[in-house]
Protein backbone atom coordinates (compact mmCIF):
# COMPACT_ATOMS: atom_id res chain seq x y z
CA UNK A 1 0.00 0.00 0.00
CA UNK A 2 1.41 3.39 -1.04
CA UNK A 3 2.21 5.86 1.72
CA UNK A 4 -0.25 8.76 1.77
CA UNK A 5 1.15 12.03 0.44
CA UNK A 6 0.13 15.09 2.42
CA UNK A 7 -0.21 18.62 1.03
CA UNK A 8 2.50 21.13 1.87
CA UNK A 9 1.31 23.78 4.31
CA UNK A 10 1.71 27.51 3.57
CA UNK A 11 3.04 28.36 7.05
CA UNK A 12 6.72 28.15 7.85
CA UNK A 13 7.68 25.22 10.06
CA UNK A 14 4.27 23.54 10.04
CA UNK A 15 4.06 19.98 8.69
CA UNK A 16 1.20 17.51 8.47
CA UNK A 17 1.59 14.43 10.66
CA UNK A 18 -1.59 12.49 9.86
CA UNK A 19 -5.13 12.77 8.58
CA UNK A 20 -7.79 13.14 11.29
CA UNK A 21 -10.90 13.09 9.13
CA UNK A 22 -12.28 13.50 5.65
CA UNK A 23 -15.27 15.44 4.33
CA UNK A 24 -16.96 16.30 1.06
CA UNK A 25 -14.41 18.77 -0.28
CA UNK A 26 -11.38 18.14 1.90
CA UNK A 27 -9.76 16.79 5.03
CA UNK A 28 -8.68 17.76 8.53
CA UNK A 29 -5.11 16.97 9.52
CA UNK A 30 -2.95 16.96 12.61
CA UNK A 31 -0.10 19.41 12.00
CA UNK A 32 2.97 20.14 14.12
CA UNK A 33 5.91 22.51 14.29
CA UNK A 34 8.96 22.70 16.50
CA UNK A 35 9.12 26.16 18.07
CA UNK A 36 12.34 26.68 20.06
CA UNK A 37 12.32 23.05 21.14
CA UNK A 38 8.62 23.02 22.03
CA UNK A 39 6.34 20.93 19.81
CA UNK A 40 3.11 22.72 18.87
CA UNK A 41 0.01 20.90 17.62
CA UNK A 42 -2.81 22.22 15.46
CA UNK A 43 -5.71 20.99 13.37
CA UNK A 44 -5.58 22.08 9.74
CA UNK A 45 -8.60 21.97 7.46
CA UNK A 46 -7.57 21.65 3.80
CA UNK A 47 -10.30 22.16 1.21
CA UNK A 48 -9.76 21.86 -2.54
CA UNK A 49 -12.34 22.81 -5.13
CA UNK A 50 -13.06 21.61 -7.66
CA UNK A 51 -12.28 18.16 -6.31
CA UNK A 52 -11.09 16.78 -9.65
CA UNK A 53 -11.14 17.20 -13.42
CA UNK A 54 -14.53 15.50 -13.60
CA UNK A 55 -16.09 18.41 -11.69
CA UNK A 56 -14.72 20.88 -14.24
CA UNK A 57 -15.90 18.76 -17.15
CA UNK A 58 -19.36 18.59 -15.58
CA UNK A 59 -19.42 22.40 -15.35
CA UNK A 60 -18.61 22.76 -19.05
CA UNK A 61 -21.18 20.07 -19.91
CA UNK A 62 -23.77 22.09 -17.98
CA UNK A 63 -23.09 25.03 -20.28
CA UNK A 64 -20.67 27.13 -18.22
CA UNK A 65 -17.98 29.03 -20.09
CA UNK A 66 -14.45 29.40 -18.69
CA UNK A 67 -15.14 32.74 -17.01
CA UNK A 68 -18.30 31.40 -15.37
CA UNK A 69 -16.49 28.32 -14.08
CA UNK A 70 -13.76 30.45 -12.54
CA UNK A 71 -16.35 32.74 -10.96
CA UNK A 72 -18.21 29.75 -9.55
CA UNK A 73 -15.17 28.61 -7.60
CA UNK A 74 -14.24 32.16 -6.65
CA UNK A 75 -17.66 32.44 -5.03
CA UNK A 76 -17.01 29.18 -3.18
CA UNK A 77 -13.79 30.72 -1.87
CA UNK A 78 -15.80 33.61 -0.43
CA UNK A 79 -17.70 31.13 1.74
CA UNK A 80 -14.49 30.01 3.43
CA UNK A 81 -13.24 33.58 3.76
CA UNK A 82 -16.52 34.38 5.51
CA UNK A 83 -16.08 31.37 7.81
CA UNK A 84 -12.58 32.50 8.75
CA UNK A 85 -13.70 36.06 9.43
CA UNK A 86 -16.51 34.82 11.69
CA UNK A 87 -14.19 32.51 13.64
CA UNK A 88 -11.56 35.24 13.87
CA UNK A 89 -14.14 37.49 15.53
CA UNK A 90 -14.53 34.84 18.24
CA UNK A 91 -10.83 34.02 18.65
CA UNK A 92 -9.94 33.31 22.28
CA UNK A 93 -13.51 32.67 23.39
CA UNK A 94 -13.82 29.58 25.59
CA UNK A 95 -16.74 27.91 23.82
CA UNK A 96 -15.96 28.57 20.16
CA UNK A 97 -13.18 26.83 18.24
CA UNK A 98 -10.21 29.19 17.93
CA UNK A 99 -8.99 29.80 14.38
CA UNK A 100 -5.34 30.85 14.07
CA UNK A 101 -4.60 31.35 10.37
CA UNK A 102 -6.00 31.17 6.85
CA UNK A 103 -4.46 30.90 3.39
CA UNK A 104 -5.97 30.41 -0.06
CA UNK A 105 -3.92 29.37 -3.10
CA UNK A 106 -5.31 29.44 -6.65
CA UNK A 107 -4.90 26.31 -8.75
CA UNK A 108 -2.25 26.55 -11.45
CA UNK A 109 -4.83 26.33 -14.24
CA UNK A 110 -6.72 29.28 -12.76
CA UNK A 111 -9.80 27.18 -11.98
CA UNK A 112 -10.39 26.62 -8.28
CA UNK A 113 -8.55 27.01 -5.00
CA UNK A 114 -6.83 25.21 -2.18
CA UNK A 115 -7.89 26.61 1.20
CA UNK A 116 -5.95 26.08 4.43
CA UNK A 117 -7.47 26.90 7.83
CA UNK A 118 -5.35 26.31 10.95
CA UNK A 119 -7.23 25.85 14.23
CA UNK A 120 -6.68 24.66 17.77
CA UNK A 121 -6.47 20.87 18.09
CA UNK A 122 -9.56 19.44 19.79
CA UNK A 123 -11.43 16.16 20.18
CA UNK A 124 -14.76 15.77 18.35
CA UNK A 125 -17.77 15.07 20.55
CA UNK A 126 -18.53 12.04 18.37
CA UNK A 127 -15.11 10.60 19.24
CA UNK A 128 -15.41 11.38 22.95
CA UNK A 129 -18.73 9.61 23.45
CA UNK A 130 -17.44 6.36 21.94
CA UNK A 131 -15.88 5.60 25.33
CA UNK A 132 -19.39 5.24 26.75
CA UNK A 133 -20.75 1.84 25.76
CA UNK A 134 -24.09 2.53 27.40
CA UNK A 135 -25.72 5.66 28.76
CA UNK A 136 -23.90 8.97 28.40
CA UNK A 137 -23.63 10.64 31.84
CA UNK A 138 -26.20 13.37 32.41
CA UNK A 139 -23.49 15.65 33.82
CA UNK A 140 -21.72 15.52 30.46
CA UNK A 141 -24.92 16.30 28.55
CA UNK A 142 -25.64 19.28 30.81
CA UNK A 143 -22.09 20.57 30.35
CA UNK A 144 -22.41 20.31 26.56
CA UNK A 145 -25.72 22.17 26.73
CA UNK A 146 -24.42 24.98 28.90
CA UNK A 147 -21.19 25.44 26.94
CA UNK A 148 -22.86 25.50 23.53
CA UNK A 149 -25.55 27.85 24.88
CA UNK A 150 -22.67 30.15 25.85
CA UNK A 151 -21.37 29.87 22.29
CA UNK A 152 -24.80 30.75 20.92
CA UNK A 153 -24.97 33.80 23.18
CA UNK A 154 -21.71 34.96 21.62
CA UNK A 155 -23.13 34.32 18.16
CA UNK A 156 -26.20 36.34 19.10
CA UNK A 157 -23.99 39.22 20.21
CA UNK A 158 -22.58 39.33 16.66
CA UNK A 159 -26.01 38.80 15.06
CA UNK A 160 -24.89 35.43 13.67
CA UNK A 161 -26.90 32.24 13.16
CA UNK A 162 -24.74 29.09 12.92
CA UNK A 163 -27.33 26.95 11.05
CA UNK A 164 -25.46 23.63 11.28
CA UNK A 165 -25.32 22.54 14.92
CA UNK A 166 -24.80 18.78 15.10
CA UNK A 167 -22.57 16.40 17.10
CA UNK A 168 -19.86 16.51 14.41
CA UNK A 169 -19.50 20.28 14.86
CA UNK A 170 -19.05 20.19 18.64
CA UNK A 171 -15.52 19.73 20.00
CA UNK A 172 -14.02 19.35 23.46
CA UNK A 173 -10.71 20.69 24.79
CA UNK A 174 -8.27 18.87 27.05
CA UNK A 175 -9.72 20.95 29.90
CA UNK A 176 -13.26 19.69 29.30
CA UNK A 177 -14.65 22.80 27.61
CA UNK A 178 -17.08 22.12 24.76
CA UNK A 179 -16.74 24.33 21.71
CA UNK A 180 -18.80 25.10 18.64
CA UNK A 181 -16.97 24.88 15.33
CA UNK A 182 -17.45 24.89 11.56
CA UNK A 183 -19.05 28.23 10.74
CA UNK A 184 -18.97 27.46 7.00
CA UNK A 185 -22.69 28.12 6.50
CA UNK A 186 -23.21 30.64 9.32
CA UNK A 187 -24.86 33.90 8.30
CA UNK A 188 -25.81 37.20 9.83
CA UNK A 189 -29.47 37.58 10.76
CA UNK A 190 -29.96 40.05 7.90
CA UNK A 191 -29.36 37.23 5.41
CA UNK A 192 -30.92 34.34 7.31
CA UNK A 193 -34.63 35.08 7.31
CA UNK A 194 -34.72 34.14 3.63
CA UNK A 195 -36.09 30.66 2.95
CA UNK A 196 -32.87 28.75 2.34
CA UNK A 197 -32.28 25.12 3.28
CA UNK A 198 -28.79 24.50 4.65
CA UNK A 199 -27.20 22.36 7.33
CA UNK A 200 -27.86 18.78 8.34
CA UNK A 201 -31.52 17.74 8.04
CA UNK A 202 -31.00 15.30 10.91
CA UNK A 203 -30.84 18.26 13.32
CA UNK A 204 -32.60 20.93 11.28
CA UNK A 205 -35.60 22.85 12.60
CA UNK A 206 -38.90 22.17 10.76
CA UNK A 207 -39.20 25.77 9.54
CA UNK A 208 -35.81 25.51 7.83
CA UNK A 209 -36.74 22.25 6.10
CA UNK A 210 -40.04 23.81 4.99
CA UNK A 211 -38.15 26.85 3.62
CA UNK A 212 -40.02 29.21 5.90
CA UNK A 213 -38.48 32.33 7.40
CA UNK A 214 -36.32 31.64 10.44
CA UNK A 215 -33.87 33.21 12.86
CA UNK A 216 -31.60 32.38 15.77
CA UNK A 217 -34.15 30.06 17.38
CA UNK A 218 -33.24 27.37 14.83
CA UNK A 219 -29.82 27.01 16.49
CA UNK A 220 -31.45 26.47 19.88
CA UNK A 221 -33.71 23.83 18.34
CA UNK A 222 -30.75 22.00 16.76
CA UNK A 223 -28.81 22.06 20.03
CA UNK A 224 -31.85 20.61 21.78
CA UNK A 225 -31.89 17.75 19.29
CA UNK A 226 -28.20 17.06 19.92
CA UNK A 227 -28.81 16.86 23.67
CA UNK A 228 -31.88 14.68 23.14
CA UNK A 229 -29.77 12.38 20.94
CA UNK A 230 -27.13 12.11 23.67
CA UNK A 231 -29.71 11.25 26.32
CA UNK A 232 -31.72 8.86 24.14
CA UNK A 233 -28.99 6.25 23.61
CA UNK A 234 -27.78 8.15 20.53
CA UNK A 235 -31.17 7.92 18.85
CA UNK A 236 -33.05 10.92 17.49
CA UNK A 237 -36.69 11.68 18.44
CA UNK A 238 -39.40 9.12 17.66
CA UNK A 239 -36.84 6.30 17.49
CA UNK A 240 -36.96 3.70 20.26
CA UNK A 241 -33.80 4.04 22.35
CA UNK A 242 -33.69 0.32 23.10
CA UNK A 243 -33.35 -1.26 19.67
CA UNK A 244 -31.60 -0.76 16.32
CA UNK A 245 -34.05 1.05 14.02
CA UNK A 246 -34.84 0.06 10.46
CA UNK A 247 -34.49 2.47 7.56
CA UNK A 248 -38.27 2.88 7.40
CA UNK A 249 -38.43 3.69 11.12
CA UNK A 250 -35.76 6.35 10.72
CA UNK A 251 -37.60 7.92 7.77
CA UNK A 252 -40.91 7.89 9.66
CA UNK A 253 -39.28 9.47 12.72
CA UNK A 254 -37.77 12.22 10.57
CA UNK A 255 -41.14 12.90 8.93
CA UNK A 256 -42.88 13.19 12.32
CA UNK A 257 -40.26 15.61 13.60
CA UNK A 258 -40.46 17.73 10.44
CA UNK A 259 -44.24 17.85 10.88
CA UNK A 260 -43.69 19.35 14.33
CA UNK A 261 -45.05 16.52 16.48
CA UNK A 262 -44.24 17.00 20.20
CA UNK A 263 -41.12 15.07 21.18
CA UNK A 264 -42.00 11.78 22.87
CA UNK A 265 -41.17 11.44 26.55
CA UNK A 266 -41.65 7.67 26.79
CA UNK A 267 -38.73 6.72 24.54
CA UNK A 268 -36.35 8.69 26.73
CA UNK A 269 -37.62 7.10 29.96
CA UNK A 270 -38.31 10.65 31.28
CA UNK A 271 -34.55 11.11 31.59
CA UNK A 272 -34.07 13.37 28.58
CA UNK A 273 -37.23 15.32 29.35
CA UNK A 274 -36.17 16.15 32.90
CA UNK A 275 -32.55 16.99 32.00
CA UNK A 276 -33.45 19.21 29.05
CA UNK A 277 -36.16 20.94 31.10
CA UNK A 278 -33.60 22.00 33.72
CA UNK A 279 -30.95 23.32 31.31
Which ranges hold each PLM region?
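Conserved catalytic-loop aspartate of Hanks-type protein kinases
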Residues: 219
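Short beta-strand micro-motifs within the conserved protein kinase catalytic domain, predominantly
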Residues: 98-113
Amino acid sequence: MDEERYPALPWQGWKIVKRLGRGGYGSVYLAQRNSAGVMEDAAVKVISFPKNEEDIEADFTDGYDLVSVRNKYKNMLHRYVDEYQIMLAFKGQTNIVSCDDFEAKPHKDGIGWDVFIRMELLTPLTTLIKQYAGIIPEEMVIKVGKDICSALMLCDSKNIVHRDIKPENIMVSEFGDYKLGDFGIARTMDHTTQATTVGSERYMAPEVIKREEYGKEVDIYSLGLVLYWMLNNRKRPFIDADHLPTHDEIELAQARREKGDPLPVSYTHLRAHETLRHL
